């Protein structure tokens, strides 16, 4: 059986309300705006806004535009951007597994044309993994990787299980670079394997990486 990445494209478990709410919560906190202040600006009950940010309620029509005007954001509600971001993520990891570097660079070249729209959409968290790979294998920026790790570890409920498996695998590769952090790498690889199918590329990548972890 050929290796494959199992994509949960037909039954995605993370609701879009959670993705939108978490996106706005992060943008609000980045600007040091309290929940109470934003609720006051929106003339909205603080508890209702909190529920929105935690994905417990649907966004009323026009509310995204209102919040955008206050936070100076531009959230794109086109769901296709989310699906596209997932597609990029899986293609990048597959090309990584088969060592097709030029194919990876070609994907990132395409991404640059729509990056601003993707990052300001339901794809925000998925795209952070795409960025993590870029900083891991192309630009090699450790501080950016740690920054993304902190963000995503606090918002794992905004990622699908197949996305988490790739995310953990990439972090395992990152921490495996230093023998002193091999125990962290081991933990991430094992957690990644728990999230993916044993016939998947992600699982195979983890097993390959674990051999060197155990050898050191």
Language-model features: where?
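A short, Lys/Arg-rich alpha-helix, primarily the initiator
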Residues: 2-31
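Short C-terminal boundary/hinge segments that cap the last helix of small helical domains
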Residues: 10, 72-90
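Short alpha-helical DNA-recognition segment
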Residues: 31-51
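DNA major-groove recognition helix of helix-turn-helix/homeodomain DNA-binding modules
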Residues: 60-77
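Alpha-solenoid helical repeat architecture
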Residues: 79-80, 119-125, 159-167, 198-209
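Tandem amphipathic alpha-helical repeat scaffolds
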Residues: 87-99, 126-140, 165-180, 205-216
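Single-residue signature of alpha-solenoid repeat helices
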Residues: 104, 144-145, 185
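Amphipathic alpha-helical segments of tetratricopeptide repeats
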Residues: 108-116, 149-157, 190-198
């Amino acid at each position: 059986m050929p290796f494959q990445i199992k994509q949960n494209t037909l039954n995605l478990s993370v609701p879009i309300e959670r993705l939108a709410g978490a996106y706005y919560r992060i943008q609000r906190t980045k600007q040091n705006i309290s929940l109470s202040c934003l609720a006051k600006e929106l003339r909205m009950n603080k508890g209702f806004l909190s529920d929105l940010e935690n994905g417990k309620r649907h966004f009323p029509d026009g509310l995204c535009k209102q919040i955008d005007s206050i936070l100076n954001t531009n959230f794109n509600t086109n769901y296709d951007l989310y699906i596209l971001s997932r597609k990029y993520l899986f293609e990048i990891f597959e090309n990584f597994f088969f060592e097709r570097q030029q194919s990876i660079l070609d994907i990132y070249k395409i991404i640059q044309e729509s990056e601003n729209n993707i990052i300001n959409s339901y794809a925000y968290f998925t795209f952070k993994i795409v960025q993590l790979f870029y900083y891991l294998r192309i630009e090699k920026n450790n501080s950016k990787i740690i920054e993304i790790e902190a963000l995503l570890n606090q918002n794992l409920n905004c990622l699908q299980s197949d996305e988490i498996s790739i995310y953990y695998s990439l972090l395992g590769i990152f921490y495996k670079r230093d023998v002193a952090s091999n125990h962290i790498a081991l933990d991430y690889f094992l957690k990644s394997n728990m999230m993916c199918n044993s016939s998947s590329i992600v699982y195979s990548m983890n097993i390959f990486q674990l051999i060197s972890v155990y050898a050191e």
